[in-house]
Amino acid sequence: MSPQQVVNAFCQALNDEGVEASLRYIADDCVYQNMPFPPVHGPQGVRDTLLGFFEITGPVRIETLHQAAAGDYVFNERLDHFAPPGGRPFPLPVAGAFQVRGDKISTWRDYFCLRQFAAGTGLSL
């Protein structure tokens, strides 16, 4: 698979099958960072971070608006749609930067507005 296909397959697995299934696209030494927060490492770090987020937001539905690749790097502009338990659904604009090695994501950084996230989830900053 091309790097773009790996990222697309990862996002689709997260949408359709959930966190556990999506981890098959994460490299053992992956570094994942939601840029307002410290990085985590490996599939277990990705798993723990996503599950922690989804406790607050409910499951995600990723809508990729635009995507480009340069070599092993894939950049996408997304709306991550959330439906918090007991709250109102909200879209979160996200810019994602991925590096793919073989058929696995080795680096993943997401950039988003923490204030928008807090407003959507009802969390205070």
Question: Across the structure, where does each feature detected by a protein language model lie?
Answer:
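A beta-strand edge to alpha-helix "cap/lid" segment located at domain peripheries
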Residues: S2, D48-L125
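A short, structure-level motif marking secondary-structure boundaries and short turns
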Residues: P3-Q4, M35
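Short acidic-aromatic low-complexity motifs
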Residues: Q4-Y25
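Short, flexible active-site loop motifs that bind/organize anionic cofactors or intermediates
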Residues: A9-Q12, P36, T107
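A solvent-exposed, acidic/Ser-Thr-rich amphipathic alpha-helical stretch
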Residues: V19-G71
